[in-house]
């Protein structure tokens, strides 16, 4: 049985990915800063016959991450699948951005991904097999007004993905990224999409050939494909799950 760690797993995309990987037969570490919500997702998985363990950690705190990873390893064994989904968002005009806002965005979105990946990597190296999926954002591809700090932090994730693919490929480890676009029931959706005028929301939805807003399960399906044994020749790629918005 493969063991997967999913960060930001208590709600939205992370919760959907956790459920999907568990349904595919993996033991899943449901890691989030929100311990009660993470426990609820893990309980749902276990009640459905899967295997899951709720974990609490701040991904910017290396010692907390190490402790969470050790708990998951003790429960289920070595971790060979990692989904870096945890992150924050924000909206502020570029000219009004503060150093603190910029630094915090990169600390969580970029440094957090760096820390978790470094902590889990020894398990993958020892196994000679691993799958890393980073959840970035379509904002990193197209840019987003009032979101310079967010877009840049997610763009760094795409660059990190390509670099890890090159470094880790010879070790049997792949690394890919998925940049979602306006997915329902997520922090991004609630803060930006749902708050926009209905005319703007309709225009965004119609911008791609699949005229609907994305669902967390859409991202989970792509992630489940990327972590399969059969996708070992796919690495360093940006898998756009965006309804065809960026063709």
Which sequence ranges carry the predicted segments?
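Short, small/polar-rich loop/turn modules that mediate ligand/substrate recognition or access, typified
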Residues: 83, 169, 174, 234-236
């Amino acid at each position: 049985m493969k063991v997967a760690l999913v960060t930001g797993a208590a709600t939205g995309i992370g919760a959907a990915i956790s459920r999907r990987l568990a349904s595919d037969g993996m033991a899943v570490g449901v890691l989030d800063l929100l311990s009660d919500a993470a426990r609820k997702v893990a309980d749902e998985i276990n009640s459905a016959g899967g295997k899951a363990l709720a974990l609490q950690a701040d991904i910017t705190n290396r010692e907390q991450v190490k402790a969470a990873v050790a708990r998951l390893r003790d429960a289920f064994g070595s971790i060979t699948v990692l989904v870096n989904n945890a992150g924050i968002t924000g909206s502020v005009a570029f000219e009004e951005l503060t150093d603190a806002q910029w630094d915090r965005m990169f600390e969580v979105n970029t440094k957090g991904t760096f820390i978790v990946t470094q902590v889990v990597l020894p398990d993958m190296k020892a196994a000679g097999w691993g799958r890393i999926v980073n959840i970035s954002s379509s904002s990193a591809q197209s840019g987003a007004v009032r979101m310079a700090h967010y877009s840049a932090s997610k763009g760094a994730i795409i660059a990190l993905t390509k670099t890890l693919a090159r470094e880790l490929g010879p070790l049997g480890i792949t690394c890919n990224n998925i940049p979602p676009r306006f997915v329902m029931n997520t922090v991004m959706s609630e803060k930006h999409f749902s708050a926009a005028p209905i005319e703007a929301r309709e225009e965004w939805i119609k911008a791609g050939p699949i005229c609907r807003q994305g669902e967390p399960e859409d991202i989970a399906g792509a992630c489940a494909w990327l972590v399969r044994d059969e996708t070992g020749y796919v690495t360093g790629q940006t898998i756009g799950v965006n309804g065809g918005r960026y063709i």
